[in-house]
Amino acid sequence: MTKELCMRCYISGRVQGVWFRASAKKLAEQLMISGWARNLADGRVEVFACGKEDKLEEFYTWLQKGPLNARVDVCTRENLPWEDYISFDVL
């Protein structure tokens, strides 16, 4: 059985105003990942995501590229213990 865990990522570059959070939500829902994404005042996007380890790996790979109009310069990741979220929200 695949392990369930959470991760917190900080994404910097041209990641605000390019549908990054909405695109992340769409993919997260397809991968059955819960959590949230929000813009930060310093121009980064913060993502907290929980799901099966293999699905989180796929999601993280996408976060490193982002949607078509984004430019990701840095994407950091911290693995965290499982938390039970119901949906993936854009904050």
Curated annotation (Swiss-Prot):
The active site is at residues 21, 39. Residues 6-91 form the Acylphosphatase-like domain. It catalyses: an acyl phosphate + H2O = a carboxylate + phosphate + H(+). One of its GO terms (molecular function) is acylphosphatase activity. Disulfide bonds: none annotated. PROSITE patterns: ACYLPHOSPHATASE_1, ACYLPHOSPHATASE_2, ACYLPHOSPHATASE_3. Its EC number is 3.6.1.7. The keyword Kinase does not apply. The keyword Lipid metabolism does not apply. Pfam families: Acylphosphatase. InterPro entries: Acylphosphatase, Acylphosphatase-like_dom, Acylphosphatase-like_dom_sf, Acylphosphatase_CS. Signal peptide: none annotated. Keywords: Hydrolase. Belongs to the acylphosphatase family. NCBIfam families: PRK14451.1 (NF011022). This is Acylphosphatase. It comes from Legionella pneumophila (strain Corby). The gene is acyP.
